[in-house]
Amino acid sequence: MALMTMVQALNRALDEEMAKDPRVVVLGEDVGKRGGVFLVTEGLLQKYGPDRVMDTPLSEAAIVGAALGMAAHGLRPVAEIQFADYIFPGFDQLVSQVAKLRYRSGGQFTAPLVVRMPSGGGVRGGHHHSQSPEAHFVHTAGLKVVAVSTPYDAKGLLKAAIRDEDPVVFLEPKRLYRSVKEEVPEEDYTLSIGKAALRREGKDLTLIGYGTVMPEVLQAAAELAKAGVSAEVLDLRTLMPWDYEAVMNSVAKTGRVVLVSDAPRHASFVSEVAATIAEDLLDMLLAPPIRVTGFDTPYPYAQDKLYLPTVTRILNAAKRALDY
């Protein structure tokens, strides 16, 4: 075991997979000489050379399109988009081509590639460096979507994504890149895509989150415990496919659920989970599902931490559910 930040865990995952499998290549803006804008790919160019670690032009369309071509010819590319906000110029390649290759070829071709994206706010990045666009990806059939919150999960799930036969959008909470450290196995391991993590057991209320907001979710659960409320905490980790069984089992047990995300509220991913809970567990709910999200505005430069779900907002939502 070694104490790692998320950046270090991601770097270790890439290094190990490149050493293990010569088909794994990395491409993106500044991923080579610079080591990536957040230094996730630091040292890989020196170790594996420019044929496997490729600096690209500033063109998301070209990055995703090139990754698809590489995947179709037998490589396993890991493409980096510097910020999730910048993926939109690459949407034609990602949505129209990458996501649909297996389906439109009748399974003759697959697209085993990963598109890594630093996502979310809390770093005073403003409206072009703070968005959480996961709803676009989960709505696109053919993509798997991962959203990690810990170094342990980051390493295990990135390795699983690289080995997956289908395209994976890998969302990394930039706010947690260096603010969280934990012990991470130095040996090889993977985690299952599609499986949530039970972070805390409880019986009175379920709190569900992923990615950027998980520190606030866990802190809210700790505050509720001081007040005698036993909150169960689920970290989804994967948004497509999301862990239906874990969510339903937890909410059926507690009868109350608060869903937390830093994405805008309208048509958010947690809205889909809330709707599914309401449809399938209506007769077991003691209160309606409650969402705590970002706001339906562009992400602000000033006071960006007030845009994020706060512990106070989560506690207020929990109180509404408990008092219903």
UniProtKB/Swiss-Prot annotation:
Substrate binds at residues 83-86, 129. The keyword Amino-acid biosynthesis does not apply. Keywords: Oxidoreductase, Thiamine pyrophosphate. Its cofactor is thiamine diphosphate. InterPro entries: THDP-binding (IPR029061), Transketo_C/PFOR_II (IPR009014), Transketolase-like_Pyr-bd (IPR005475), Transketolase_C (IPR033248). It catalyses: N(6)-[(R)-lipoyl]-L-lysyl-[protein] + 3-methyl-2-oxobutanoate + H(+) = N(6)-[(R)-S(8)-2-methylpropanoyldihydrolipoyl]-L-lysyl-[protein] + CO2. It is an enzyme of class 1 (oxidoreductase). This is 2-oxoisovalerate dehydrogenase subunit beta.
